[in-house]
Amino acid sequence: MIQSITSQGLVLYNRNFREDDKLVKIFTEQVGKCMFFVKHAGQSKLAPVIQPLVLARFLLRINDDGLSYIEDYHEVMTFPKINSDLFVMAYATYVAALADASLQDNQQDAPLFAFLQKTLELMEAGLDYQVLTNIFEIQILTRFGISLNFNECVFCHRVGQAFDFSFKYGACLCPEHYHEDERRCHLNPNIPYLLNQFQAIDFETLETISLKPGIKQELRQFMDQLYEEYVGIHLKSKKFIDSLADWGQLLKEEKK
């Protein structure tokens, strides 16, 4: 079956196919993720809009049984600030890859599309890209079938405590129940508190967000633990972010 649709879409990636052709993965609002064939991509009028992290309204020909094609486009958004900063671009690429990993091809998920688009728009607007990534990570866990409660103790259900997290129980422990897991995470209590807040944040109303570097580092470390334990994916874009910690500071110093 072949259908023509017009849909908002975000280019996730492209890869070479044959000598001068490309396969382009686009996350569309209407039909989810699809792979598109672009012939003679280097000379094609589509060349400017098949780069990663380009958002546009595409006219698409969807073929359920063969190659799909991009017929036209308009209303292009290229996120110039993201693309001009290696660090922001690395995190933007990672959240796009997470969305890709969380969704089957040809599966519509308009709320996820809107969430990813808004995340990129807030990064482009200059909000803290590391914190936005943490929020995206914690909220998208449900797409991987993971639901975590950072609001109450798993034993007594009290709220507003200095919680720690237990992988043994997959939940939080209050101080009176720390003893239930000798291998609890020994987190800064601010980490479960922030993650509980992050789960409820609506990006449509978010105007500013700021955290101290030490807290952001602790969040990053714990999010890595959560993803390793519960999701188990190892994305190239995440490995690149990890490498930034080793040599990224040198680049920042050279810019001064």
From Swiss-Prot:
Keywords, ordered alphabetically: DNA damage, DNA recombination, DNA repair
TM ranges: none
GO biological process: DNA recombination; double-strand break repair
InterPro entries cross-referenced by the UniProt entry: ARFGAP/RecO, DNA_rep/recomb_RecO_N, NA-bd_OB-fold, RecO, RecO_C
Matches recorded under Pfam families: RecO_C, RecO_N
Record-level GO cellular component terms: bacterial nucleoid
Xref: PANTHER family: DNA REPAIR PROTEIN RECO
Family: Belongs to the RecO family.
Protein name as annotated: DNA repair protein RecO
Organism this protein belongs to: Streptococcus pneumoniae serotype 19F (strain G54)
